[in-house]
A protein has these predicted regions:
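Active-site glycine-centered loops adjacent to acidic/histidine catalytic or metal-binding residues
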Residues: 9, 165, 183
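Active-site loop ensemble at the mouth of alpha/beta enzyme cores that anchors a bound cofactor
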Residues: 170-186
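Phosphate-binding site of ATP-dependent enzymes
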Residues: 160, 165-167, 175
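Active-site-proximal beta-alpha core segment in soluble small-molecule metabolic enzymes
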Residues: 2-162
């Protein structure tokens, strides 16, 4: 239960965020992810550990939440000392930092005293029976190795890693990361 992040974005995919959050809490789930700060505030009384996935950095972020960083611009604009997770693009090409941007990202997060709690990816089309999932998983393993080396270099505490969404969990024979994100799978 400590390894699960329940994803409640878009009103828990239309099923009711407060209802699903309450039920998840009853089962011992302690972590959740939502789309926006608005959604996070709706369930802040239920969960202490909330990751906001699609936030546009304003410099006015709340200390209550953890924010996903999807690009260098977000690192430059987010409020100093904010808790963050780095999104890593491993093949989805929609959001996340490219592995080639990690050196610069760490320079910024160290300079701005950002608290790196995690790093993650989202496996594109993990429900499709092709090699994409395996390629993306290897890309994430390379990114993890780079992140751990940069943490050592900059004296930053090792973050937790999470990569598997619901569909990827159905394909995985084992999960190598500290956490998984469970939302909805068909």
């Amino acid at each position: 239960k400590e390894k699960v992040i329940v994803v409640l974005k878009d009103n828990a995919y239309g099923h009711g965020a407060r209802l699903i959050a309450s039920e998840a809490k009853k089962f011992g789930i302690k972590n959740c992810a939502v789309k926006s700060e608005f959604e996070a505030n709706e369930i802040a009384d239920i969960f202490e550990n909330i990751l906001i996935l699609s936030h546009i950095s304003t410099g006015d972020e709340s200390a209550k939440f953890t924010y996903a960083i999807n690009d260098i611009d977000a690192l430059l604009k987010i409020k100093e000392n904010t808790k963050i997770n780095l999104a890593i693009d491993t093949g989805m090409h929609r959001n996340g930092l490219d592995i080639s941007e990690l050196d610069y990202a760490f320079e910024i997060l160290a300079r701005r005293n950002l608290e790196l709690l995690g790093a993650y990816t989202h496996f594109r089309a993990s429900d499709e029976l092709n090699a994409d999932y395996f390629v993306q998983r290897e890309n994430f393993n390379a990114a993890k190795a780079k992140i751990l080396a940069l943490c050592d270099e900059f004296g930053i505490k090792k973050p937790i890693f999470h990569s598997h969404n619901s569909a990827a969990l159905e394909r995985a024979s084992a999960v190598e990361d500290e956490m998984v994100r469970v939302g909805i799978a068909q």
